[in-house]
């Protein structure tokens, strides 16, 4: 049976995406908002470490879905100019409605490859997107991302870690609507994808080591970032 295009799958569930996501991550003990916000906090922490957290930077949110990251991006990094794209027309509709009060935020539908902006970006933010992209299309997508970065720019790319038992259990048990055709990406594969696309200085960090009922241990997570068993991981990769 031919797989349904992901754009159509996400169109169908755009209005109920948050409900489905809540069910999918229930075993973690956290709400989806926790995961949306933590990713932005990681970006903020990195920008602060290089003294750029207050700069007026151009950010592309590649695969923005229903726009759950934008309010946190503007909360922690209010000077950002945000351009957000997604393959799902209905998800973009929901994202525009949910974020209509935010300034300097633009949403556009795209085909997954041709990024619909003429200018280049300081940051490209990719939150758990690439495991939805068919393997045969991932290199072309990553190369398109590379070509849209300024020479001084970087991407921050988050993925689910298939080595983590809770992540794997959630993926197997939930097999939920918009994720059933995806394939989790191991960190080594992602590094090879980035290197093949000409990215340099790839830095990896592992995150989310404790479920909700052990959240009092969260303060220790910053010391565990090298352990390859976190539920999520992310790469920061530079163009040069």
Give, region by region, the residue ranges found by the protein language model.
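Class I SAM-dependent methyltransferase SAM/SAH-binding core
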Residues: 60, 66-113
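Short, glycine-/aromatic-enriched active-site segment of Class I SAM-dependent methyltransferases
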Residues: 162-180
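N-terminal, positively charged/glycine-rich alpha-helical extensions of SAM-dependent methyltransferases
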Residues: 1-25
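A short glycine-rich, Lys/Arg-flanked "PGG" loop and its adjoining helix->strand segment in the class I
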Residues: 139-151
């Amino acid at each position: 049976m031919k797989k349904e295009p992901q754009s159509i799958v996400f169109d169908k569930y755009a209005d109920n995406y948050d409900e489905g996501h809540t069910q999918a991550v229930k075993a973690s003990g956290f709400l989806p908002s926790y995961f949306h916000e933590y990713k932005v906090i990681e970006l903020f922490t990195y920008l602060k470490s290089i003294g750029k957290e207050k700069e007026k930077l151009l950010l592309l949110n590649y695969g923005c879905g229903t726009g759950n990251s934008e309010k946190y991006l503007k909360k922690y990094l209010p000077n950002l100019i945000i351009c957000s794209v997604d393959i799902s027309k209905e998800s973009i509709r929901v994202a525009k409605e949910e974020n209509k009060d935010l300034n300097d935020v633009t949403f556009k539908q795209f085909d997954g490859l041709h990024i619909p902006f003429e200018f280049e970006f300081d940051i490209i933010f990719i939150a758990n997107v690439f495991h939805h992209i068919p393997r045969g299309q991932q290199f072309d997508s990553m190369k398109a991302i590379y070509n849209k970065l300024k020479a001084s720019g970087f991407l921050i790319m988050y993925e689910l870690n298939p080595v983590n038992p809770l992540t794997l259990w959630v993926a197997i048990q939930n097999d939920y609507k918009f994720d059933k055709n995806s394939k989790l990406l191991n960190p080594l594969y992602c590094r090879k994808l980035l290197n093949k696309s000409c990215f340099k200085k790839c830095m990896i960090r592992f995150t989310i080591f404790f479920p909700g009922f052990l959240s009092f241990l969260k303060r220790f997570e910053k010391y565990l970032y090298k352990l390859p068993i976190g539920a999520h991981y992310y790469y920061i990769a530079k163009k040069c």
